[in-house]
Amino acid sequence: MDEKPSTRKSPEFCSLRYGLALIMHFSNFTMITQRVSLSIAIIAMVNRTQQPGLFNTSTERPLAFTFNHSNRSIKEFNTAEVSVYEWSPETQGIIFSSINYGIILTLIPSGYLAGIFGAKQMLGAGLLISSLLTLFTPLTADFGVILVIVIRTVQGMAQGMAWTGQFTIWAKWAPPLERSKLTSIAGSGAAFGSFIILCVGGLISQALGWPFIFYIFGSIGCVCCLLWFTVIYDDPLHHPCISIREKEHIVSSLAQQSSSPRRSVPIKSMVRCLPLWAIFMGFFSHFWLCTIIITYLPTYISSVLHVNIRDSGVLSSLPFIAAASCTILGGQLADFLLSRNLLRLITVRKLFSSLGLLLPSLCAVALPFVASSYTTTIILLILIPGTSNLCDSGFIINTLDVAPRYASFLMGISRGFGLIAGIISSTATGFLISQDSVSGWRNVFFLAAAVNMFGLVFYLTFGQAEIQHWAKERTLTRL
C-alpha cells in the first residue's frame, strides 16, 4: 500500500494542499449558491407556491386571480415592486432540471479536456461564466420562461466544467491516505453554501426583493474567480509557494499511481467494468434524492408546513448544517479507519455508502407519516441531507481508488449519471405534486427511497477499491 511515504509527512493543516481544499470549498460554496438561488427566489417569483391550494390551478388563470388569493403574502415580503410570474409546478420542474441538462452536456468532454489543458483554467472559466449568468438571471426572467431555461442550461454547462475539473486536481494533490479528508473539506462547501443561500435568501428577498439574491451571489462568484486564478495551480510540482517537504510528501505518496504519458482512454474496458457501474449506480441513486431536497425543500416547507418565504428559507437551511458537518466528520473518520488499519479500503467505502443511502431512505419514507408534526418533520428533513453526505467518503471518491489515472474523466461520467437522475427526479416531482399535493409528496419520497435501495444493493454487490487492470501502469496494460 502507500502508507510508507506518509512517514515523512508534512504538517497537514498549515500545508498548501489544505489551503487548496479551503479555496475549493469556497468555489463549491459559490456554485451551489448560484444553483440554489432559484429554489428560494421562486417562492417570491411565483406566488402560487405560497398557496398550497393553488397547485392545481391552470396556468391560464389571469394574474389578477393570483393577486386576489395572495395579496397579504405579497405585501408581507415586499414583492409587489418586482415581477411575479405564472409558472405552473410542471414548468418549475423543467426550470429546476434545466441546469442539469447543461451540466450533463459538458461533464464528459470537460473531464477529458481538463486532463489535457489543465483543470485550473477549466474550473476557473466555468465558475466565471456561471457567476455572470447568475447576475443576468433576473433580467432574463422578464423575457419569458424559455430564455430562463436557456440561461440555466448554459449555466449548467459552465458548472459542469467546474465540477469535473476538481478531481483532476485532487488526483495530483491528494495523498491516498488524505483523500477522504481533503475531498470532504472541499465538498462540504456545497452543503455550507446550501445552508447560507437558504438561510439568507428569504431575508434578502424580503428586504431587497428577489432579484438581489442573484445579484449578491453572482458577485461573490466573481470575487471567488479572482482568488482561484491567483492562487491555484494544477499540480504541486509547478506551484511557486509550496515547501520542498510538502512537495516531496505528495509526490512520493502518489508515486505508485503516477500517470505514464497520456494515451487513449480505454472505453471498452470501462464499459465492461462492473465496479465502475457500481459507482455510477451509486451516483444515480444519491443524486435522485439529493436533487429533490436541494431543489424542492423550500417549496415543501412552504406548502406542507405553511410558512412564509423568510421562515421557509431559514428552515430549509438547517439540513445543510448537518450535511456540511457529516461531510467533514465522515472524511475524518474514514481516513482514521484507514490510517490505523482498522478496516480495509473497500470496507470503508461500502460502510459509508451504506450509511449514506440507507439512512436518508428511512427518513424519506417516514416523512409522509409525520407531516402533522412540525418538529418531527424538521428533524427528518435535517437528517436526510446530513446522512446522505456520508456517501462522500464512499462511492463518491471511489474513482480515485479504482482508476486514479482517469479520475476526472470517470467523475464526469459519474456525475452524468447523477444529473440524469436529477433531471428525472425534478421533472417527476413537479408532475407528482401538481396532481395532488399530499399523495404527490408521499409518492415522491417512496420512489426516492426505492431508487436509493437499488443503488445500495448494486454497489454492495459489485463495488471494489483495487486499481483496475486497465488503469495500471504501462507494464500491466493491454497490448
Curated annotation (Swiss-Prot):
Gene Ontology biological-process annotations: sodium ion transport
SUPFAM superfamilies listed in its UniProt record: MFS general substrate transporter
Any Pfam family: MFS_1
Alphabetized UniProt keyword annotations: Cell membrane, Glycoprotein, Ion transport, Membrane, Sodium, Sodium transport, Symport, Transmembrane, Transmembrane helix, Transport
Residues the record marks as carrying a glycan: N28, N47, N56, N68, N71
Main location: membrane
Single GO cellular component term: apical plasma membrane
Catalysed reactions, as listed in the record: 3 Na(+)(out) + phosphate(out) = 3 Na(+)(in) + phosphate(in); urate(out) + n chloride(in) = urate(in) + n chloride(out)
Superkingdom of origin organism: Eukaryota
Locations listed in the record: Apical cell membrane
Gene Ontology terms, MF aspect: symporter activity; transmembrane transporter activity; urate transmembrane transporter activity
Transmembrane regions listed in the UniProt entry: 99-119, 131-151, 184-204, 212-232, 274-294, 318-338, 351-373, 378-400, 413-433, 443-463
Membrane topology field: Multi-pass membrane protein
Function: Acts as a membrane potential-dependent organic anion transporter, the transport requires a low concentration of chloride ions. Mediates chloride-dependent transport of urate. Can actively transport inorganic phosphate into cells via Na(+) cotransport.
Protein family per UniProt: Belongs to the major facilitator superfamily. Sodium/anion cotransporter family.
Name used for this protein in its record: Sodium-dependent phosphate transport protein 3
The species this protein was found in: Bos taurus (Bovine)
Lineage, broadest ranks: Eukaryota, Metazoa, Chordata, Craniata, Vertebrata
